[in-house]
Amino acid sequence: MSEIREARLLKANSLINKGFEPYAETFKISHSTRFLNEKFGYLDNGQEFDLNVSLAGRVLAKRVMGKIAFFTITDQEGKIQLYLEKRIIDDYEINAKLLSFEDLKEIVDIGDWIGVFGTIKKTNKGELSIKVSKWEMLSKSLQPLPDKWHGLTDIEKRYRQRYLDLIVNPLSKTVFKTRAKCISLIRRWLDEKNFLEIETPILQSEAGGAEARPFITHHNTLDIPLYLRIATELHLKRMVVGGFEKVYELGRIFRNEGVSTKHNPEFTSVEIYQAFSNYIDMMNLTEDLIKNIVLSCCDSLVINYQDKVIDFSKPWKRISMKNVVKEYTGIDFDSFDGDLNKAKKFSEEINIEISPKINTLGRLLNEVFEQKVESQLIEPTFVTDYPIEISPLARRHPKNKEMVQRFELFIAGRELANAFSELIDPVDQRQRMQLQQSLRDAGDLEAHCIDEDFLQALEIGMPPTGGLGIGIDRLVMLLTNSSSIRDVIPFPLLKPELTSNKSEKSTSNEVK
């Protein structure tokens, strides 16, 4: 590797010695590769089109055959072939003191960025090309591009050096284009329905709105601890109290938790709050929004995900947590009449692992669901009516005070969205926050703290409100048929690599 770098440094310095800059300041582009391929793909073999174009890209392939060369370059939109002929380039070089054909052969390596000027030509073999009249070096690459991508080690390298992944793996570019499109579509859909995007604090004095461990930092001037937000919920609700009836925020969330194919400590979500609505209204909103995104990104409401076919076009199933647990496990939690020990016995018979934290029927119900049911929910399914003890910010269910008006959406065996009829009763909310605080004081680091300012806001008065959160990364996984959340996050969190303390020594051939 060092020998290749040394050779390329020599080439960069040879450009300098000839009076040319190996790292250009700017370059004027007239067209993209995508435009040219779409506009002139109709040309017959051997046909030329007299349109002057200038474009730039990274060299991916290089073939030199005597006085003719063929390069392939790529830009953000695609790739195109360059047809380079010594006679044409050298004619321009003599008159304008430009880089010659020999310079092109000797100095340009795969990985370099170059800019070219020329006209349109389709070769006799049917390859649309730029017939190059002159060229410029825009950025000399000192390291070679990788040749192969296979095996665990290379997967790790794709995540650590995403720039290399994007260069050699066109599918990765497609994934991140789809991600950008998805985010843009969500914002546009909400904006068109008169939702207002709000920016809430990332640094917060209290970490609330979810059961999760926060990242902790310290503000030096104020000499206080601060937390990276684990949700945007409580601040968005404050905006509803203040009179904004339809609000949302699409942004980054931080949770000091594990890393897996489904979890990254830093992730993207959209939270949406709509006054005068309940969780049924938010269910309808969720279905409409996600169907719109899927159709726009995939051109169909039926998609392939891994080895499954998922049909978004049918009405989505809606079923309570108790009923879906009964359907998949045979356990009827209504039959236990509040007897936790009896429920534990039935749960252990189907190999449920029960931790000491599972000390209520509601928590046990949720544990059975997560261990035995969740992974089997492939088609879009709204699971409704959650236990109150795991939903401290949701409104009680009018028909069962031990449950709340909450749903989670599951697709392909993963949670994709979470929503409530929001709890707007300040007395009930205080009691539940006090219970959460007692759990936190007893060592549960994921339990909520009491947020006095939020409780004060509720006492001012909050209208009936439905709230919803959607995980953007998991949605993009579905849209792009990606098996790991790391595939859809440009720079996922990774454990640092062990590196040598010795830095590479500079040589006399450094570009100067």
Swiss-Prot record:
Major subcellular location class: cytoplasm
Keyword Magnesium in record: yes
Amino-acid positions noted as binding Mg(2+) 2 in the UniProt annotation, renumbered to this chain: 415
Residues that coordinate or bind Mg(2+) 1: 408, 415
Any one GO BP annotation for this protein: lysyl-tRNA aminoacylation
Cofactor binding description: Binds 3 Mg(2+) ions per subunit.
Cofactor: Mg(2+)
Enzyme class: ligase
Keyword Lipid metabolism on entry: no
InterPro entries for this protein: Aa-tRNA-synt_II (IPR004364), aa-tRNA-synth_II (IPR006195), aa-tRNA-synth_II/BPL/LPL (IPR045864), Lys-tRNA-ligase_II (IPR002313), Lys-tRNA-ligase_II_N (IPR044136), Lys-tRNA-synth_II_C (IPR018149), NA-bd_OB-fold (IPR012340), NA-bd_OB_tRNA (IPR004365)
Protein name: Lysine--tRNA ligase
Organism whose genome encodes this protein: Prochlorococcus marinus (strain MIT 9515)
